[in-house]
Amino acid sequence: MSADQEPVAFLAKQPWRPKQVTEDPDEEDEEDGDEGKNGFSLEEVLRLGGTKQDYLMLATLDENEEVVDGGKKGTIDDLQQGELESFIQNLNLAKYSKSLIEEDEPEKKENASKKEAKLLKVENKKQKATEGKKTSEKKVKNKTVAEQRPESCPVSKAKKDKQPDVFEFLERQTMLLRPGGKWYDMEYSGEYSLEPQPPDVVSKYKALAQKLYEHEVSLFKSKTNNQKGGSSTWMKAIVSSGTLADRMAAMILLIQDDAVHTLQFVETLMSLVKKKGSKQQCLMALDTFKELLITDLLPDSRKLRVFSQHPFHKLEEMSSGNKDSRDRRLILWYYEHQLKHLVAEFVQVLETLSHDSLVTTKTRALVAAHELLCDKPEEEKALLVQVINKLGDPQNRIATKASHLLEVLLRKHPNMKGVVCGEIERLLFRSNISPKAQYYAICFLNQMVLSHEESELANKLITLYFCFFRTCIKKKDIESKMLSAILTGVNRAYPYSQIGDDKVREQVDTLFKVLHVVNFNTSVQALMLLFQVMNSQQTISDRYYTALYRKMLDPGLTTCSKQAMFLNLIYKSLKADIMLRRVKAFVKRLLQVTCTQMPPFICGALYLVSEILKAKPDLRSQLDDHPESDEENFVDVGDDSDDEKFTDADKGTATDAVKEVESKETEPESSAEAEKPKAASWVHFDNLKGGKQIKTYDPFSRNPLFCGAENTTLWELKKLSEHFHPSVALFAKTILEGNCIQYSGDPLQDFTLMRFLDRFVYRNPKLHKGKENTDSVVMQPKRKHFMKNVRDLAVNSKEFLAKEESQIPVDEVFFYRYYKKVAVVKDKQKRSADEESIEDIDDEEFENMIDTFEDDNCFPPGKDDIDFASNMKKTKGAKADLEDSESSDGELGDLDDDEVSLGSMNDEDFEIDEDGGTFMDVSDDESEDAPEFADANPKANTKKSKRKSEDDFDFAGSFQGQKKKKKSFNDSSLFVSAEEFGHLLDENMGSKFDTIGMNAMANRDNASFKQLKWEAERDDWLHNRDVKSIIKKKKNFRKKMKAPQKPKRQRK
């Protein structure tokens, strides 16, 4: 190379930099100097046989800045594009470098300003450069660009080739998910995202997840098929060819073992539920599928998610590039998506079954929907709508069942009250809703238990109630049950609401108008609402007390079902009243009303009076004197005559009577008429002034303030103290004595006739429980029976009789005294029976007894055949205790005839009066000579006793009886004159058989003696009275006597 020729300049340093950077003039000058010194150029390399790549390699030997994707190009440690960057991002170093970044920002600004200055210099130098240099630089630049293009092309091609690999399906030889455990407890099942995902990405991942899941299931099947063992083989056989119940049980076991890989069995159960062939099969599969969802498939704390609700934009980041981890997530998410669709399909099937024609099918579907709603949050909105819709079912059983299930739901989940009320409100305002459905919905709402923290819900309910109240008034449907249910709901929701008084005042006048035309139960609800509204405002009006005073005389009080509520309302009203005169009038009328009521209501009213007297002691002045209203007072007029004038105690005093008589003489008739007492009506003008004074009691007054109740006494208590019911008499006497009634039970339930009859038959009454699994008991007062431990005992039990009489309730003293006497009698009878010794019969005695019946003549004539009393003969050696029997007879005499059973009666019970008795079989003259029978054994008919019952003939009694009193027995009454049966003697004259004994037979057809004898023997054989039968009985008896006997029963 000649010295005057300049070498070609080439910038090999950082060829990938931008154009403006590579054209730096300072660098060019430096490079030119270096190349000039070294004599190294591209042309030199080409001349020596090298290539362009050789030149680039040699030119970059001393450069340390040429790095491609984290490593030197062409070396072994060359990294893929972006791999180092992703690794650094995973280290999360960015959060630690915030302060460093802030410090580097001003330096970057300085560098940027320097670069701008350099660019200006470059532009100036370009103008001064020679044309040769420009041409050489352009060539070098063209070569460098050509060098850069082939390097950048493989990177972009690698990115394009790598993107389809994300959704590529790779088959594996092993399962990714291990069997066992709940699927929702696995590691990746709780990952979700609320952000919307790109639809195209979701569809691609879903297709990949489907392939992965199908491949996973196929691996599971091949694994189970290759298993060898008795249990697996038996399970396969049952699932394929067993009965319906066995198949479902086997499928449940398989699903419980591994739910993810056995989704096909879940689909099989779903198809059995949808099958329309057999109702029994459908219901069986329904219960099975429901239990499977509750116990194994559905999570407790969350709903199932669809496939698009998962974070696919972070999937690669969460899996850290691990395809196994990513595929596990995709399989679980796809399984959850499929399961959610199956559950939604099951809910639709429940909706279809709930409209079935059979009551059983509808009930089972309703119960299944309720259990899923209570236990799991999945599809709760659809299930709630189903249960609420059944409130309008045409059959009352289904509607009441739905109401009960909703109450159970609110007890388990109190936070759902607002949601349930909202759904019921939508049901009530439907256009095609039936009145019965509205009634059931209102009844459910008024049974809802509220609290003071739920004032908004109470306000909403009151607004709803008043809306339907106005509708009922417009329709003039005041006699319906709907109005009573609405008022009940308002009464229960008003204490918890914060609604304005204006809304309630709008309905007060309407309530007063409705009060007098509806039935008694509805009027009680209206009065309760009026009292709550007025009491909350401390403005209880006279109009309210007048309406309540009038309602006490309503005939419906006797038969209504809200007597307790009415008495409670009276008690609250009287306790809040400050007018003592009005309280006296209410107490007086209440005692008057009790005269026509049953004992339970009377006891409740007396208890109310006792509590009022305790709260207002000034009322005790009414108890000072107790004149009897039926008697009359004798008052002297003061005339010379001795005549007496009769005046009523309530109509006036003695001085008033004298004045009235004197006025008749002096004043004219017109003034006398003006003096007559007038019946008090509403509040008169004179009463307001205080000028009119009422001196007598007017029971027919409409206003309790001006009825004159303070001028009379509570004489009704005197009559009630003589009531036939012991509890009523006790309560009345307690009040008259000035004491308070101590009773903590419910008199309206404790003193009913049904409770008395339950105790009479030794059965404890049913406990009045509230609705099970509900909070309805919150609305009822606490029930504490007075002397509860005594009332729980049976009246004939030993524990009951062991109590003292003072510890027994008054209404059960009758049982106590009765069974006390019976227990004493039974105890003495047992003692006397134990003291009696029963002797065994010897063989000789039995032989003598048999000989009396065995005779050569089958028809033995004689008087002994008909001598019934001959059997009651005197025996020797018998043990008898006559004194004990006589003493027991005296103690039995204390009991009434109705209280003693026939088994405990003796001679004195059979004595005949002058007019005769029930057991009079002989004449009065001969009754004294009747034999005295022994006391009957109370256990004569038991298995252990050797005696027979009184109805059977006692053979052994003829030989071992007790000592009897020596009384002659005249048997003349057993025979009659021969004229009465003389015609029988005439007809049977000349026959050789008995015609006058107890075995006599008539022979009107003149049958032969042999014929009659054969018939007699046949009759004896049929009735086991022949000789062979008697001998057989004798042998059996001897065997029985030779057998070892049981020891005698010990005395108690």
From Swiss-Prot:
Top-level taxonomic group: Eukaryota
Residue ranges, compositional bias (Acidic residues): 23-34, 627-643, 883-932
Keyword Transmembrane helix recorded: no
Tissue: Ubiquitous.
Subcellular locations according to the entry: Nucleus
Principal subcellular localization: nucleus
Record field: compositional bias (Basic and acidic residues): 122-150, 644-677
A Gene Ontology term for the protein's cellular component: CCAAT-binding factor complex
Sorted UniProt keywords: Activator, Nucleus, Phosphoprotein, Transcription, Transcription regulation
Residues the record lists as Phosphoserine modifications: 629, 641, 837, 958, 972, 977
Disordered, as annotated region: 1-40, 122-158, 621-677, 876-969, 1032-1052
SUPFAM superfamilies: ARM repeat
Keyword Phosphoprotein: yes
Family: Belongs to the CBF/MAK21 family.
Purpose: Stimulates transcription from the HSP70 promoter.
PANTHER family (UniProt xref): CCAAT-BINDING FACTOR-RELATED, CCAAT_ENHANCER-BINDING PROTEIN ZETA
Protein's name in the database: CCAAT/enhancer-binding protein zeta
Organism: Mus musculus (Mouse)
Lineage of source species: Eukaryota, Metazoa, Chordata, Craniata, Vertebrata
